[in-house]
């Protein structure tokens, strides 16, 4: 095997190990109910379905239920929605005092849309995959310590809650880096903050003994391959989500793909489910 190929493989393996916090991977059991929470990176997965497909390919006989509760603008403590009362905008008790002060205003929302806690309980969630950090990173380094306190409180609350039959398994996934797109962005400013927040997330995850997946570092290597993986540098396209899906599934779960032949049909079924 050529030396450059060996080096590439070793680099990938080292990166893969470095991107995990060291805690055990998620062990999905039969009939487990999995919920995604977080902001844009997780929210946009519903449009492409690749990550869900990768999970089902690894656990074809587990009768899993997967629901995506992510939405752009969400933070660990703030989940805005105009159709629920003011206190329902916050993800857990005490969150209002921990979120950015600009998000603490009373906007007079009204309605009966379920709160984040109600969704997790109604879904009887056993496993929670958390996609936070991207929009928070735009607050800059000066807000990092506040964000870490918000994230720490969220993880402690989530790990101590019971939504299904027992406390949920929890994993935290960092944002990917911004890809340089000519005429749009070189990503340097955004990536400086994203790296700072990724490292902060890793610290908080380790403190709470939560599996952490660094998606920022490997994404930089993906961009070096020369393929456009995003529509504007930040928001992934289908190719970007395909690559991210395989990386996340390998990083989060113990099982590998059982039958790749079913990928296309399974992806079609996932997309039909997500349409409704």
Which positions does each model-derived feature cover?
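Bacterial N-terminal signal peptides that target proteins for export
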Residues: 1-10
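Boundary at the C-terminal end of the N-terminal hydrophobic targeting segment
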Residues: 22-24
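Substrate-gating cap/lid alpha-helix
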Residues: 180-215
């Amino acid at each position: 095997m050529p030396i450059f190929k060996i080096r590439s493989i070793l680099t990938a393996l080292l990166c893969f190990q470095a991107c995990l916090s060291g805690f055990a991977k998620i062990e999905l059991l039969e009939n487990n109910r999995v919920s995604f929470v977080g902001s844009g990176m997780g929210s946009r997965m519903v449009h492409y379905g690749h990550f869900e497909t990768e999970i089902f390919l690894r656990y074809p006989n587990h009768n899993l239920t997967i629901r995506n509760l992510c939405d752009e603008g969400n933070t660990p403590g703030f989940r805005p929605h105009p159709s629920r009362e003011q206190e329902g905008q916050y993800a857990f008790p005490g969150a209002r005092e921990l979120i950015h002060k600009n998000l603490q205003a009373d906007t007079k929302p009204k309605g009966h849309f379920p709160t984040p806690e109600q969704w997790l309980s109604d879904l009887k969630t056993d496993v929670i995959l958390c996609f936070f950090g991207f929009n928070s990173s735009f607050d800059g380094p000066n807000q990092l310590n506040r964000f870490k306190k918000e994230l720490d409180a969220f993880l402690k609350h989530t790990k101590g809650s019971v939504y299904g039959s027992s406390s949920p398994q929890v994993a935290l996934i960092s944002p990917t880096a911004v890809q340089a797109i000519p005429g749009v962005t070189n990503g340097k400013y955004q990536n400086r903050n994203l790296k700072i927040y990724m490292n902060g997330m890793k610290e908080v995850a380790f403190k709470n003994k939560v599996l952490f997946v660094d998606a920022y570092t490997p994404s930089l290597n993906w961009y070096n391959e020369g393929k456009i993986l995003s529509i504007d540098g930040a928001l992934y396209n289908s190719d970007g989500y395909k690559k991210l899906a395989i990386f996340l599934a390998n990083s989060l779960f113990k099982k590998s793909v059982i039958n790749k032949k079913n990928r296309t049909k399974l992806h079609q079924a996932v997309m039909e489910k997500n349409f409704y």
